[in-house]
């Protein structure tokens, strides 16, 4: 019985491997053909010669973070901890 189980498992894994391999090969073939087709279109001059503002890369960009602190702010974790301590009888923080 052990040999039959191994054979069935081996066949299943072979099918999974085959499907994966053919999927990868098919997607590579599709990708290469679509890229070749787009490069032929660009060589023909069918694409616009004037670059638009959207297609240009930004020359430089940055991220700015603004942090605003409130004077009497209590974090949510501290609120939950105080609520938990009020139910369990533990010492909570005094306001």
Swiss-Prot record:
**Transmembrane feature ranges:** 13-35
Give the UniProt subcellular location, in the record's own words. Answer: Mitochondrion outer membrane
For this chain, the annotated S-S bridges are none
Q: How does the protein associate with the membrane?
A: Single-pass membrane protein
Per its record, what are the GO molecular function terms?
A: protein kinase binding; transmembrane transporter binding
Q: Single GO cellular component annotation?
A: mitochondrion
Tissue specificity = Detected in kidney (at protein level).
What family does this chain come from, according to its entry?
Belongs to the SMIM26 family.
What's this chain's function? Answer: May play a role in cell viability.
The misc remark on file is: Suppresses clear cell renal cell carcinoma growth and metastatis. In renal cancer cell lines, interaction with SLC25A11 maintains mitochondrial glutathione and enhances mitochondrial metabolism. In renal cancer cell lines, interaction with AGK promotes AGK mitochondrial localization and inactivates AGK-mediated AKT phosphorylation, leading to inhibition of AKT signaling and repression of metastasis.
By what name is this protein known?
Answer: Small integral membrane protein 26
Q: What is the lineage of its organism?
A: Eukaryota, Metazoa, Chordata, Craniata, Vertebrata
């Amino acid at each position: 019985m052990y040999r039959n189980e191994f054979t069935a498992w081996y066949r299943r894994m072979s099918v999974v491997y085959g499907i994966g391999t053919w999927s990868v090969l098919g997607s590579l073939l599709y990708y290469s053909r679509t890229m070749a087709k787009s490069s032929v279109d660009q060589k023909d001059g069918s694409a616009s010669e004037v670059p638009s503002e959207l297609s240009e890369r930004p020359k430089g960009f940055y991220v700015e973070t603004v942090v605003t602190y409130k004077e009497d702010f209590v974090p949510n974790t501290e609120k939950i901890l105080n609520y938990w301590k009020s139910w369990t009888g533990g010492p909570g923080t005094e306001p």
